[in-house]
Amino acid sequence: GGYMSAMPQKPEIQNEKPNATLEALLRGYVVASIGTRGRTLKDGEKFIGKAPAAIVDLKAAVRYLKFNDKFMPGDANKIISNGTSAGGAMSALLGTSANAKEYEPYLKELGAAKADDQIYAASIYCPVTNLEHEDEAYEWMFGDLDKFERIDFSSLDAASFNDRSKKPKMITGELNATQKELSRE
């Protein structure tokens, strides 16, 4: 999440349930879990994970799978990307930017295989695509913003929540010392 570097996901049990990778394997899917560079990745003093690094890594992985299709199980023409939050945004971008020429210089520099990067489908969950709004959330979550305001859901039912003509009751507050320490990790 947060456009950070992503390690390939291992199939395992999390919170007494199979994670998405294990669930897919249990249902007979072929899974290729891809690691990507993220916004905080450095090589010495230089940031090397800034945009478009993550999407270039994903496109390179798709090209690798397609280039090697005859040597592996499954069908590389049926690749379905899956992601949540920043991963959802990456999945959406991967699904809508097939063979886009804008990425070619980056893919060439990376040494990506000579193949197309079109995928069959994208499975997208709560994609973070409005970065202007997300910047505010990151500032609060990862910065020095300690005051908050949120909707008081305790007295709302579905009808009152969906009635946009009335402003909902709000709760305002400030993080306590423990919460401040956690938000700065």
What is the meaning of each model-derived region?
Residues M7-Q14, P105, S155-R164:
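Surface-exposed intrinsically disordered loops and tails
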Residues F47-F71:
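Alpha/beta-hydrolase active-site loop
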